[in-house]
Amino acid sequence: MELYEQTIHNLQTQLQARQVSSVEITNSFLDRIESTDQSINAFITVTKEQALLDAAAADQRIAAGNCAPLTGIPVALKDIFLTEGVRTTSASKMLDNFIAPYDATAWTRMKSQGAVLLGKLNQDEFAMGSSCENSAFGPTRNPWNKDHIPGGSSGGSAAAIAAQQAVATLGTDTGGSIRQPASHCGCVGLKPTYGRVSRYGVIAYASSLDQVGPMTRDVTDAALLLGVIAGYDPKDSTSVDCPVPDYTAALQQGVKGLTIGLPKEYFIDGLDADVQQAMEQAIAVYRQLGAEFVEVSLPHTNYAVATYYLIATAEASSNLARYEGVRFGHRAKDTAGLIDLMMQSRSEGFGAEVKRRIMLGTYALSSGYYDAYYIKAQKVRTLIQQDFNEAFRSVDLLLTPVAPTPAFRIGEKTADPLQMYLSDIFTIPVNLAGICGISVPAGISSNGLPIGLQLLGRPFGEETILRAAFDFEQATQWHTKKAAL
């Protein structure tokens, strides 16, 4: 097995035993990126020289007996995380040449534990999209079938795992942007509880919905990474001050005796036949493992997409007001005064989908429509949260599909924004409720594309969904399937 095919925990063991060096591992991934990324387009920036310097320094620390959980492990970040001295674009022309002056907290924590940065990953511009087609740097392609999308907005983060260009990546999840691409690319994607991981240094899309999480090859690595990045951060006012458990220790507990809820609103007519079959097979596996199932109802699910696209766009309208060509960001040339400068800079700097969402959000917040749209959406959001609270009174976790279909073809939905938005119908409610969710590989479609299973837990119930995901992973081995590049 090549070094680039392995997991964090396997590489850790070899590094600590001095069987391999971090420089060798890092070179293996850099060579893999060089040989495969022209056809995948997962990376916006590759930090080759710095990565090799950091890997050499990691080898020195290992030789001195100073080995942290991620020492010498090469990782990559969605290009929405600020990285000091490294270009951070959020896949937008607006930030094409922006060099961050400080690190995001999540990356600071990974770096403090010895991680080596391979580079920054492609995404939908400002995390607005479900297909990774809305990037100023071109679309990312799914390594399983390059005519298909990898999912979004963390499409590069998922594609890099599937193409074996990185052992682990970080993404962000605002309406499914970790879980949906993980499902489409056959990897593990964890969206933690809102407030579990600091958002400091993450370019904001919708501040009440955004959450940082890991994308990995298996559940053990996801648990390990979450343990590194989770925890209170005084720099993030939404960060929650509660203890961080040892997530890897809970993995072996299994699901025997757990009650799993099946939300009837998620198993609907129109669900792709391959997805339906994968869910039925997953339920059968869990029954064999000793879990019990009950049907539950989340009655306001049908309102989730509309609610999300009012709240998220309203917050985006506010967050993206700072990009006006004066303080930072793209600055238009040959303009007639300040107002024209701002208008031209934003017109040139933002892509079509970002402009669409800014306009939707500005409209929802405008005088005369604020109560009718934004306030009403916040009230429905509360009802969706209450639906989940009620469901968790009788179950330990929920099992659902991640997406209604496997990955669709590039360009298939770009002309129909509503159809694109509806592809996140099973992931959006989780962000509105602020709970945790994980996508794990659960099958392969008839046309050879991965299908993911979604497990949802109570707020700060990551241990439960991780142990359930691990039990399923060990019983099925879907996570060992690899894209043929």
From Swiss-Prot:
One of its GO terms (cellular component) is glutamyl-tRNA(Gln) amidotransferase complex. Signal peptide: none annotated. The keyword Protein biosynthesis applies. InterPro entries: Amidase, Amidase_CS, Amidase_dom, AS_sf, GatA. One of its GO terms (molecular function) is ATP binding. Heterotrimer of A, B and C subunits. This is Glutamyl-tRNA(Gln) amidotransferase subunit A. It comes from Trichlorobacter lovleyi (strain ATCC BAA-1151 / DSM 17278 / SZ). The gene is gatA.
